[in-house]
Amino acid sequence: MSYRITGSTGEWEIVVGLEVHAQVVSEAKLFSGASAEYGGEPNTHVSLVDAGFPGMLPVLNRECVAQAVRTGLGLEAEINLFSRFDRKNYFYADLPTGYQISQFAHPIIGKGKVLVDLADGSTREIGVTRLHLEQDAGKSIHDQDPTRSFIDLNRAGVALMEIVSEPDIRSPEEAGAYLRKLRQILRYIGTCDGNMEEGSMRADVNVSVRKPGETEYRTRCEIKNVNSIRFVMMAIEVEAQRQIEVWEAGGTVDQETRLFDHVRGETRSLRSKEDAHDYRYFPDPDLLPLVIEQSWVDELKAALPELPEAKRARLEQEYGVSRYESSVLCVEQAIADFYETVARGADARLAANWMLGDFFAALNRTGRSIEDSPVSAEGLRELLGLISDSTINGKIAKEVLEDMVETGDSASAIVERKGLRQVTDTGAIESAIREILAANSDKVEEYKGGKDKLFGFFVGQTMKAMKGKGNPALVNETLKKLLSE
């Protein structure tokens, strides 16, 4: 179902394109040997190139180029064997050179696509226009002194990939799904950590509105540097609503750059939107055009890990998990790997149910992730094996899992220590049931008189008497036999 916003003149459609700035995972910066590591004391990860000292020449980091190519391959995009670096000229205090080295006319990556899953079960393809490499700027700090601002150049010169989508997004939900999928791909490939809270992935959001059926785009506004998926979705809604109100009041929307204030739930004008000529782009005279070999691209492609969509399809085929289950299991590569280790030696469906249910719930309660789980994949597999061979039942297994999370002990050790082995002795089960039936003779008569729901009562009382250790199937079977006497 199409997303629409209703105004005083009827329904409106939103049109969104996203420019995602993803920090490249590399040890050094794009054109210098300074560390690209996040954090550190201010101005400790700075070379003379980053600081814009006269006479310092940029030297391209080969690994950053490789990371851009890997990302392009992950986006099923065109890899341009010829690309070029340009100077984007503008003045800002945290840009020491007075220009940013970027790629304007000839980006390293061309058209690609991202496949996103939506809440209604449908799938949409969002086009990628281009990906280019560029330098990040430094950081201006305004809250340390009432009269002065400070500059930290640790981030200056760090390699960024700017990934530009086509204006294919038609709802806040689609924008969120696109960003989540893009981040997932980058993390799988290892080209960006996707930590939006650290600024290593942020989005500029281009929003316009139009009447359903219109084919031309109306004037768009760009919302700069939105640093969470939730805020991107909120910003789209409030900016679209603002533009609709402007159009319906008989006004026109100005092309401008805006900021999103999540506290007030509004966007505010920052400056008029710049065009390319405002930046006076020209080829960087200190850098040769970038020419890469197809054979190198092929090598990088052959070494890529299995990508999310391929992994999902394989899990569904090999292990019989549902589309929803595969989407959750493949959110992170570590989760998918954990699941496969469990499923290889256990009932694959049981493994999926337990991971998505009790196991994730236990991790969430203790504030842990899959990487620092106190229960290993082998440990969870052992627990599921105890269920499958009827050593313990599902209810007891939940108790054992809680103990495993708290103590780190193995499932079998906990079962032995606590005496939790399931009772499969039919004589012991029959004895327990006879005691329950004798103590509840009135309910036995009611059951035999047609009150079938009491069967669950007898099962519950039996399991309680056996401290949850009775084999459920044997309890049910024996109970039916005794009640029919």
Curated annotation (Swiss-Prot):
The keyword Flavoprotein does not apply. This is Aspartyl/glutamyl-tRNA(Asn/Gln) amidotransferase subunit B. It comes from the Bacteria. It catalyses: L-glutamyl-tRNA(Gln) + L-glutamine + ATP + H2O = L-glutaminyl-tRNA(Gln) + L-glutamate + ADP + phosphate + H(+); L-aspartyl-tRNA(Asn) + L-glutamine + ATP + H2O = L-asparaginyl-tRNA(Asn) + L-glutamate + ADP + phosphate + 2 H(+). The lineage of its organism: Bacteria, Pseudomonadati, Pseudomonadota, Alphaproteobacteria, Acetobacterales. The gene is gatB. One of its GO terms (molecular function) is ATP binding. InterPro entries: Asn/Gln-tRNA_amidoTrfase_suB/E, Asn/Gln-tRNA_Trfase_suB/E_cat, Asn/Gln_amidotransferase, Asn/Gln_tRNA_amidoTrase-B-like, GatB, GatB_C_1, GatB_Yqey_C_2, Gln-tRNA_amidoTrfase_suB_CS. Keywords: ATP-binding, Ligase, Nucleotide-binding, Protein biosynthesis. Heterotrimer of A, B and C subunits. PANTHER family: GLUTAMYL-TRNA GLN AMIDOTRANSFERASE SUBUNIT B MITOCHONDRIAL AND PROKARYOTIC PET112-RELATED, GLUTAMYL-TRNA(GLN) AMIDOTRANSFERASE SUBUNIT B, MITOCHONDRIAL. Its EC number is 6.3.5.-. Belongs to the GatB/GatE family. GatB subfamily. Allows the formation of correctly charged Asn-tRNA(Asn) or Gln-tRNA(Gln) through the transamidation of misacylated Asp-tRNA(Asn) or Glu-tRNA(Gln) in organisms which lack either or both of asparaginyl-tRNA or glutaminyl-tRNA synthetases. The reaction takes place in the presence of glutamine and ATP through an activated phospho-Asp-tRNA(Asn) or phospho-Glu-tRNA(Gln). One of its GO terms (biological process) is glutaminyl-tRNAGln biosynthesis via transamidation. NCBIfam families: gatB (TIGR00133), PRK05477.1-2 (NF004012), PRK05477.1-4 (NF004014), PRK05477.1-5 (NF004015). Pfam families: GatB_N, GatB_Yqey.
